[in-house]
């Protein structure tokens, strides 16, 4: 399943942040922190041709990274969620974007591709390389 991340999410983030700035008493510091993390996640997803949210100790994350290592990807960003200061909130925001809080999560050209199982299936069907080529990641 591929989900196109649209500007609607960015618009929602901007509206939320603008509302916070206009009426700060209605929002908590936690709300602002969530918004900041959401903005950082979206910046990484949209700022790189290939983005992976991973955990260093997760076997599925390791497998997905091994799949990607077979390709000479020219713009790959790997974010090790377990090394982030607010891992729990980051996973919560990833769930808002993709419907999943688990890792790994692979994005190509701003599109959510899936986790290890989906990536393996796409590669087995011969569709991963064309996705990477369309994204100009190879």
Regions found by a protein language model. Name each.
Residues 37, 57-60, 64, 86-90, ...:
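Alpha-helical interaction elements in eukaryotic regulators
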Residues 108-138:
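Non-catalytic, surface beta->alpha helical segment in thiol-disulfide oxidoreductase systems
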Residues 58-61, 91, 104, 111, ...:
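Domain-wide signal for the mature, well-folded portions of proteins, strongly enriched
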């Amino acid at each position: 399943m591929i989900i196109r991340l649209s500007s609607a999410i960015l618009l929602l983030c901007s509206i939320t942040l603008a509302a916070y700035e206009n009426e700060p008493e209605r929002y908590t510091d936690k709300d602002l922190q969530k918004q900041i993390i959401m903005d950082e996640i979206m910046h990484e997803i949209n700022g790189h041709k290939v983005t992976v949210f991973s955990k260093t100790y997760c076997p599925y994350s390791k497998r997905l990274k091994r799949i990607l290592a077979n390709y000479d990807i020219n713009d790959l960003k790997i974010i090790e969620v377990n090394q982030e200061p607010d891992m729990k909130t980051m996973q919560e925001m990833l769930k808002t974007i993709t419907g999943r809080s688990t890792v790994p999560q692979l994005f190509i050209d701003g599109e959510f591709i899936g986790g290890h199982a989906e990536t393996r299936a796409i590669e087995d069907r011969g569709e991963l390389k064309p996705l990477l080529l369309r994204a100009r990641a190879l």
